[in-house]
Amino acid sequence: MASMVSFCFLLLFLAFFASSFNEIYAEESESKEFVLTLDKSNFFDTVSKHNFIVVEFYAPWCGHCKKLAPEYEKAASILSSHDPPVILAKVDANEEANKELASEFEVRGFPTIKILRNGGKIVQEYKGPRDADGIVDYLKKQSGPPSAEIKSIEDATNLVSEKKIVVVGIFPKFSGEEFENFSALAEKLRSDYEFGHTLDAKLLPRGESSVSGPVVRLFKPFDELFVDFQDFDVNALEKLVEESSVPTVTIFDKDPSNHPFVVKFFNNANAKAMLFLNFTSEVVESFRSIYREVAEKNKGEGISFLIGDTESSQGAFQYFGLRDDQVPLIVIQNNDGTKYLKPNLEPDHIASWVKEYKDCKLSPYRKSEPIPEHNNEPVKVVVADSLDEIVFKSGKNVLLEFYAPWCGHCKQLAPILDEVAVSFENDPDVLIAKLDATANDYPTNTFDVKGYPTLYFKSASGELLQYDGGRTKEDFIEFIEKNREKSSKKESIVKDDQTDSETKAEL
């Protein structure tokens, strides 16, 4: 569930961060199609024949997929002339027959692009651009050697950019256990980082030039600018690279060069502290300075730190249910989705508030829409602040839908649930309800919501079942009748009445 929370959170941030795509022309091309069309029947047979193949999982209704399509086709055309040719393919993951395939490759949204190596034995995420030229450049690098040899200062200058992370191995010779382990690391992490190797540290722009190796040097555009490692265990190297490639404080603003670090921030396993303020305000430098001190003091303590400009952070405000009049503010989110909020923050509050968080002295913050003043529709509206009362403490049999306002399947389901609710309108033991999961927090350890709509049934006695049956009116009614129980509140009232009667009789 933690991965779903992080995944959804990340999407909301990136929706406000990503730069717009180039405008797409709508003319139909009569030229040859270079993108292979795969499905369940030919997927594995095709993939097994290629040492390197790229597969897009798409849905016909997906707007981003439609924007990508001509760029992807153009890239496939160009890469067909590469030596050796780079094959691009696509799978309609909306087709019923291909849904199992999409599930196997952990497709959680569209479009999802995977790089498959060694006949499909190695699967990696595509993490490159989505315009034709960007796709071509990225895949040329990905299809080549995982690490580039640095033979000159020019080679080093071309590889080690001021705005990206690069991992370079320095060796006395390109053989032996250390070099093999470095090569294995480069192969494993090539989708995330660029790698190089050299026999001469003097060619490199930063760091001790007299080192003969073996040493791994990570170059980065923040903090201490480079770090040297000498532990050549692959797992240890990977951990060191991952930890060193996250800034002490990640910057979230409109600068596209910060984008990869924002992604890494949300993908790491730490709790996430996020300070939001107006970057044009007079107090911004005071906040930055103190926040960085706190981040450095808590390094290695399981908390990652980000500072975001309110102008660029509307996705976060939507996700957390925050308001501009609460700025400056700080939020900490655990991987289980629990959140803690300190609005109207002063710089000297930061250190003490983070300490209170670490000492478990803070009360969780819960995002909730207002409880409706009138809730008279057949399907009852549930918000975070009324979830306990309406669902868990009502003593009723409750069918609860978790939905998103933008979800097409949810819109299709809405009139059906209305009909189901009307069918039980005069039944005091049954309630049909809905909760906007994008606007309200809910206990993620109780409800496993991986997509929309997700439905749960809570019986009168409190037993919880996830509904995975059909979606007709008859399907829902049959399920409710099969799993319903007598109202626990009604039984309690009867017992209380009986006790009162017995007491009166004794008197």
UniProtKB/Swiss-Prot annotation:
Q: Name one Pfam family in it.
A: Thioredoxin
Q: Gene Ontology terms, cellular component aspect?
A: endoplasmic reticulum lumen
Tell me a GO biological process for this protein. Answer: protein folding
Matching entries from InterPro entries are given as: PDI_thioredoxin-like_dom, Prot_disulphide_isomerase, Thioredoxin-like_sf, Thioredoxin_CS, Thioredoxin_domain
Q: Which residues are glycosylated?
A: 181, 278
Point out the annotated site residues (description: Lowers pKa of C-terminal Cys of first active site): 130
Q: Does the keyword tRNA-binding apply?
A: no
Annotated region described as Disordered, given as residue ranges: 484-507
Just give the chief location class. endoplasmic reticulum
List UniProt keywords, sorted A-Z: Disulfide bond, Endoplasmic reticulum, Glycoprotein, Isomerase, Redox-active center, Repeat, Signal
Database matches in CDD domains: PDI_a_family, PDI_a_PDI_a'_C, PDI_b'_family, PDI_b_family
Tree of life domain: Eukaryota
Top enzyme class, one word, equals isomerase
What does this gene product do?
Participates in the folding of proteins containing disulfide bonds, may be involved in glycosylation, prolyl hydroxylation and triglyceride transfer.
| Name this polypeptide is given | Protein disulfide-isomerase
Q: What is the lineage of its organism?
A: Eukaryota, Viridiplantae, Streptophyta, Embryophyta, Tracheophyta
Its gene is PDI
